[in-house]
Amino acid sequence: MAEEKELVLLDFWVSPFGQRCRIAMAEKGLEFEYREEDLGNKSDLLLRSNPVHRKIPVLLHAGRPVSESLVILQYLDDAFPGTPHLLSPANSGDADAAYARATARFWADYVDRKLYDCGSRLWRLKGEPQAAAGREMAEILRTLEAELGDREFFGGGGGGRLGFVDVALVPFTAWFYSYERCGGFSVEEVAPRLAAWARRCGRIDSVAKHLPSPEKVYDFVGVLKKKYGVE
């Protein structure tokens, strides 16, 4: 029974949203049980746990479900305050901390609204619409690089380590190769500092353990193309 475990994650191997949760729990040193979902035949547990959206990831904490990856990340900060924070701790009356939290949330939302959406269109489209999506993706990556600046990590929790934005964005680095192949550009050329950040993150144990290889992701994209008749 999932309710007997402290933390259980209902997930799918290639989902960047589920990977966020896995990386966050690894960064916090939290042990959890991973349960792979068949998205073509979703489990009763998943459907009961997320009846509104009926999708992964879902975190079960002592049997209580928490849905939506960015919500889960913030929940982990709140539920396990003794672990490293992804967001700057909320201190009453601390305007700087409040601003840092708001900024981190903005950029995590940007990743979901812009990068994920554009990435999905890249493999679904053909011809000039696909090329236009490739140009859009290049601009999105440049925008993220500008926000990163000369910092080692985006931060959000402080301390020169992975923060909220890093954990939100880093799973998509496993998709960079697919974006390049579909969009006709090079991440290294359009956003070299962001590419360096991706390599730096990839050397961190919590990231390396939970991200699939770019080649495996590209193979999965090929399966999706065939499934939806794109090829």
From Swiss-Prot:
CDD domains: GST_C_Tau, GST_N_Tau. PROSITE patterns: GST_CTER, GST_NTER. GO terms for cellular component: cytoplasm. The keyword Ion transport does not apply. GO terms for molecular function: glutathione transferase activity. One of its GO terms (biological process) is glutathione metabolic process. It catalyses: RX + glutathione = an S-substituted glutathione + a halide anion + H(+). Pfam families: GST_C_2 (PF13410), GST_N_3 (PF13417). Conjugation of reduced glutathione to a wide number of exogenous and endogenous hydrophobic electrophiles. This is Probable glutathione S-transferase GSTU1.
